[in-house]
Amino acid sequence: MSGLTIFSDSDASQPIWQSQDADAIQKQLNDIGVRFERWEASQKLSDAPSSEEVLAVYQHEIDKLVAEKGYQSWDVISMRSDNPQCAELRTKFLSEHIHHEDEVRFFVEGAGLFCLHLNGKIYQILCEKNDLLSVPAGTAHWFDMGPEPHFTAIRLFDNPEGWIAHFTGDKIADVYPKLEC
């Protein structure tokens, strides 16, 4: 189940707000300019879907977002625990960074934890299948796929070059709860 936990960015020990209610999550995130919606990822995928399979099955959803926001490129990120780059990628994504464009993800299977550092708070968003998340350009954040990742998400970009991170060097991600599933 999707969830949102909010912390002060100066106290990782005590959440100041938590919910698993999609409407409450959407309101909290919309209030800070973050788009969160529950979509329907109902298409059946194979056990280890290729990028081509995922893109073909969800072309309608991609087309909707492209028409709405003018995205120039999209791809699929799919991670399983047997991926030889799993630990390396987890470490990379756990480093706080920003993008000069919105970061848009539609989760079609599995889960991951997006952590936003915004307005003196940390917003930890557990995204699962059916979740659409759009993080505004310039928002400091990190992503935790967990020690045993299992997720597939469609990523959409304003930039035809795709995912380009600008790391902040802040070690704040080291002190907040991680995804342990």
Swiss-Prot record:
It catalyses: 1,2-dihydroxy-5-(methylsulfanyl)pent-1-en-3-one + O2 = 3-(methylsulfanyl)propanoate + CO + formate + 2 H(+); 1,2-dihydroxy-5-(methylsulfanyl)pent-1-en-3-one + O2 = 4-methylsulfanyl-2-oxobutanoate + formate + 2 H(+). GO terms for molecular function: acireductone dioxygenase (Ni2+-requiring) activity; acireductone dioxygenase [iron(II)-requiring] activity; iron ion binding; nickel cation binding. Fe(2+) binds at H97, H99, E103, H141. Pathway: Amino-acid biosynthesis; L-methionine biosynthesis via salvage pathway; L-methionine from S-methyl-5-thio-alpha-D-ribose 1-phosphate: step 5/6. It comes from the Bacteria. One of its GO terms (biological process) is L-methionine salvage from S-adenosylmethionine. The record marks E96 as: May play a role in metal incorporation in vivo. Gene3D superfamilies: Jelly Rolls. Its EC number is 1.13.11.54, 1.13.11.53. Keywords: Amino-acid biosynthesis, Dioxygenase, Iron, Metal-binding, Methionine biosynthesis, Nickel, Oxidoreductase. Its cofactor is Fe(2+); Ni(2+). Binds 1 Fe(2+) cation per monomer. Monomer. This is Acireductone dioxygenase 2. It comes from Pectobacterium atrosepticum (strain SCRI 1043 / ATCC BAA-672).
